[in-house]
């Protein structure tokens, strides 16, 4: 309703203009005054401005009164809907009265002739159960359809029965699932029109594959494959061909040359030694030494000692404890860690702040923070 009211406001000016254009009476030339009217409605978020034309004051007032009387009589024949009645009442409360009734914009319902009754014949089947229940439900609410719905349901075509399938020796019987399905349908009175066996093609008679060629390079199946074939044979499954033909023989590659040993070659680390020993216990011997893959450590020159000066401060307590912990485990750093800690800059002390009347004291949290720092020997020279 709100959308209808909001959309009607822009059309009020056009409706008033249409009243002027469609008027049938004639008047002498008169002066027309336009009065701007402000419209504000609780159904519209903002006010709208329209221009309303004042009524004509013509000498021939009989024609104008006759036109208004005929319009009032035509409005008696058709009652406006509830929404439009409320809209006219709402506009009348704001001093807006339309020049003619809005009922003339609602065309009357056309008087179409009733459709002819459908032709009933023997092929017309009755309505299904859902349609019967729907018509009964509508009849309970006083709704009666103008025509029968059975005419919209075309009759079932009289198609000829399909020809029976040709039975031959290759046709195999239905499987167990299909047999049970047909038996279940027969218990409910459903009989298929044709046999389902014709849709199952017979198994093709393919020739047996040729046996594989055995040669000296063919190695026996591994233990996993032997156990798999034995497990399948226990369940009555015999493969048509041997699986050994799918396993290519191992290539006879030449042994790699031994690596060149030099003075820079260091022995294998402890993890690699234990790995090689673990593989040797299981009969696995690597073809080459793994030491050749570990490059020797480069002989880099020792770094220059850092320049110590007066600004160099000693290591912090954490760094000193770290170096002591590493020294207990036999780890000595190659260079001093103090060179990575830049000295503290010698900045000038800041100027004291200017005290004035607007300077307010520190809040309670800042006072407690400064007191806590003073207890630990930290003195702040500048007020926060």
UniProtKB/Swiss-Prot annotation:
Q: Where in the cell does this protein reside?
A: Secreted; Host cytoplasm
Enumerate the residue ranges of region (Disordered): 247-266
Task: Note whether Repeat occurs among the keywords.
Answer: yes
Tell me one Pfam family matched here. EspF
The protein's UniProt keywords, in alphabetical order, are: Host cytoplasm, Repeat, Secreted, Virulence
User: Could you confirm whether the keyword S-adenosyl-L-methionine appears in this record?
Assistant: no
Phenotype of null mutants:
Mutants show dramatic reduction in the efficiency of pedestal formation and in the intensity of the residual pedestals that are formed.
Can you name a GO cellular component term? host cell cytoplasm
In this chain, the stretch annotated as 6 X 48 AA approximate tandem repeats covers 96-377
Q: Where is there biased composition of kind Pro residues?
A: 248-260
Instruction: Outline the sequence repeats, range by range.
Output: 96-142, 143-189, 190-236, 237-283, 284-330, 331-377
Instruction: Describe the task this protein carries out.
Output: Required for efficient pedestal formation in host epithelial cells during infection. Acts as an intermediate between Tir (via host BAIAP2) and host WASL/N-WASP. Directly binds and activates WASL/N-WASP, which stimulates actin polymerization and leads to the formation of actin pedestals at the sites of bacterial adhesion.
**How is the quaternary structure described?**
Interacts with host BAIAP2 and host WASL/N-WASP. Can also interact with host proteins BAIAP2L1 and WAS/WASP.
Record family assignment: Belongs to the EspF(U)/TccP family.
Domain comment? The N-terminal 21 amino acids are necessary and sufficient for translocation into the host cell. The C-terminal region, composed of several highly conserved proline-rich repeats, interacts with the SH3 domain of BAIAP2 and BAIAP2L1, and the GTPase binding domain (GBD) of WASL/N-WASP and WAS/WASP. The N-terminal translocation signal and two proline-rich repeats are sufficient for triggering actin polymerization, but each additional repeat gives higher activity.
Question: What protein is this chain from?
Answer: Secreted effector protein EspF(U)
Q: Which organism is this protein's natural source? A: Escherichia coli O157:H7
- Identify the gene encoding this protein: espF(U)
């Amino acid at each position: 309703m709100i959308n209808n009211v909001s959309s009607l406001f822009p059309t009020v000016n056009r409706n008033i203009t249409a009243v002027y254009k469609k008027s049938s009476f004639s008047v002498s030339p008169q002066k027309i005054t336009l009065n701007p009217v402000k419209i504000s409605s609780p159904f519209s978020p903002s006010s709208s401005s329209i221009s309303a034309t004042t009524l004509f004051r013509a000498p021939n007032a009989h024609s104008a009164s006759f036109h208004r009387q005929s319009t009032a009589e035509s409005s008696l024949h058709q009652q406006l809907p509830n929404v439009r009645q409320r809209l006219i009442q709402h506009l009348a409360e704001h001093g807006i009265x339309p020049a003619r009734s809005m009922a003339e914009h609602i065309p009357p319902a056309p008087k179409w002739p009733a459709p002819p009754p459908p032709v009933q014949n023997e092929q017309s089947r009755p309505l299904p159960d859902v349609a019967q229940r729907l018509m009964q439900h509508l009849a309970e609410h006083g709704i009666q359809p103008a025509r029968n719905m059975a005419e919209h349901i075309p009759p079932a075509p009289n198609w000829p029965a399909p020809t029976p399938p040709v039975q031959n020796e290759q046709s195999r019987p239905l499987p167990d699932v299909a047999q049970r399905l047909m038996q279940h349908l027969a218990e409910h009175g459903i009989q298929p029109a044709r046999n389902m066996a014709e849709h199952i093609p017979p198994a093709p008679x393919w020739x047996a594959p040729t046996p594989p060629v055995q040669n000296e390079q063919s190695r026996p199946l591994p233990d996993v494959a032997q156990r798999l074939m034995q497990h399948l044979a226990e369940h009555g499954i015999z493969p048509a061909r041997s699986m050994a033909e799918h396993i290519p023989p191992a290539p006879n590659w030449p042994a790699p040359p031994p690596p060149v040993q030099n003075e820079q070659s260091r022995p294998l680390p402890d993890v690699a030694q234990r790995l090689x020993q673990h593989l040797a216990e299981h009969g696995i011997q690597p073809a080459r030494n793994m030491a050749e893959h570990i490059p020797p450590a480069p002989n880099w020159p020792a770094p220059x000692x850092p320049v110590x000066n007066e600004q160099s401060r000693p290591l912090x307590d954490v760094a000193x404890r770290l170096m002591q912990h590493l020294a207990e485990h036999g780890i000595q750093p190659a260079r001093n860690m103090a060179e990575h800690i830049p000295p503290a800059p010698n900045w000038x002390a800041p100027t004291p702040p200017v005290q004035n009347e607007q300077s307010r004291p520190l809040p309670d949290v800042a006072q407690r923070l400064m007191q806590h720092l003073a207890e630990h020997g930290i003195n702040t020279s500048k007020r926060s």
